Every structure is written in structure tokens, then in C-alpha cells.
């Protein structure tokens, strides 16, 4: 339409000049056109703060654990880092003279309550849960890289504290992860990170190397990602394949040696798994 209007204006100008009998040539540069400019400034993004948690199986949807103890969120902020990790709950077992194997319970999360404009509701610095939108997920870690530049990174996992109750420890206890997948918002452009070990074991051995969960080469891995261990039935991954079995409660296993299971004092035992984003 702009081209049509410009041509019509030129024709009128030529006719006008011809009528006046002018011998001046028509000037291509005239006062009928002027450019404006558009400006935008891009800065590094920010991750962390506790309100950027999302569903590992629906990466665009904000979620919360509803004030429970299912998820630990990142209180600090920066242009890259670990945003959230799920906490393992292996339930209860009775003292016995046999090796104990217990699977972690699924992670219970809730969709975030939305305001009239569709934005997540934040109360006291935390997402407000829609208690009518309960979801069960596998154990997971969420991270993001919104740096300007950077030469890639690794996501690593390591058992940094053995299960302990005061001075009592479950010596030799291990945690096995399986059914690992990488998930992300497919609208993100660029090269994605590579999934590391999909099956691995964490032990208390201080000499053991951290397990590499995911790796991003230089210039890759920008955006937000999830590694999830166990998926709900019906979940469709980025490969387009539907998960037909619910593995949310059968993918992370605690093993306690028989000698320890028979003699450990009763009580609550807590271990620590540290997830680290090692930037290059």
C-alpha cells in the first residue's frame, strides 16, 4: 500500500510540473518520506529468587509445592544457576536383617494461581498455589543460563552428606537415579545442552567424582532446562514420544546395607545431595 501511495503522489507532481511548463527535473528525494528509528536494549537475564520455578514436564507453566517440603528453591539471584531441586522422601522402613530398598515418593507440585491478566500470583515473595491443580512429577533439577556470552557449563550432582541422625549414619547407603530425560521449552532457539548420565548412583565416598547430569558446549545451553528422573504417564518429551508408564515413584532408589538396616538407631535420617552448575 505504501508503494501505491508513493507512485500516485509522484504522478500528481509530474502533472503539476507539466501544467506549469517548468523545465526542472523531478527530484526523487522529496518531503513525502521520513524514517523513524526503533531502539531496544538487551541486558543479561536473572535467575533465582524463588519465584521462577516451573513444571519439569510443562516448562512454560509456573508451579509451587504449596508451602510443602517438596522443592528447594534458589534464594540467590544471578545471570545463571540452579533454580530449583526436588527433595527426596523415601518414607519409612522397619529395622530388619536384610538389605533395604526404598523408592522416593513422587514430587507433589501445584500450578500457580493466576490473576485476571493471567500472571502468577506472588504472596510474600512466593508463588501462590492453585490447590485444585495438583500434579505428580519425578525427581528433578531446574537450571538456566541467561548470561551474555559464556563458554558453556556442566550440571553436576554429588552426595555431600550421608544419611545421618546426629552422630548415627547409614554407612554405605546409596541413591540410584534412573529414567533421566532432558526437557525444555521447545520455543527456545539455539543449541541445547547434552544430557549426561540418565542412570547413575550417588555414594558417600568423598573421593567419588561428581556425576555430570548435563553438558553445554560454548555458546550452547542458553535458556531454561530440566533433568527429570521418572515421568508421569502421558508425558510427551521433546522427541515426540509419549511415556506410557508412570515412573514418578520408581526412578530414584535408596539402598541400605543389611548390617546397617538391622542395627541403625530409630529416628529420622537426612542426607544432602548437592547440584552444581559449573560455568566454563
Set out the residue ranges of the language-model regions.
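Sec-dependent signal peptide hydrophobic core
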Residues: 5-11
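Signature of Gram-negative chaperone-usher
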Residues: 2-4, 19-280
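Hydrophobic core
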Residues: 11-20
